[in-house]
Amino acid sequence: MSEGATYTFDQSDSSNAGHPLRFSTTSNGTHGGGSEYTTGVTTNGTPGSAGAYTRITVAVGTPTLYYYCSIHSGMGGQANTP
């Protein structure tokens, strides 16, 4: 992901039900002892429902981020941030 860019992750497909996408500076997010990263992040709706999305605007100086499912441990990875 590039600094200054905005990314929208469409979570409206039924396969996303029960898998809210979140970001953290810690691998595996809150499951790995970290906290949710919320700077520039907007969520809308319920994953698996029409109109659901997670949006992030990557600010200058954003640290390395990890994406994860806030419900299930082990569902995520590193997002390539500057």
Each language-model region and where it sits:
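Acidic Ser/Thr/Pro-rich low-complexity disordered segments
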Residues: 26-40
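Low-complexity, compositionally biased segments
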Residues: 13, 31-34, 47
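Short, surface-exposed beta-strand/strand-loop-strand elements in extracellular ectodomains
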Residues: 18-30, 81
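Extracellular/periplasmic metallocenter environments
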Residues: 15-18, 39-82
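Short edge beta-strand/loop segments characteristic of extracellular beta-sandwich folds
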Residues: 8-12
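A generic structural micro-environment signature
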Residues: 7, 27-29, 62-64
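GGW-centered surface loops in extracellular recognition modules
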Residues: 1-5, 81
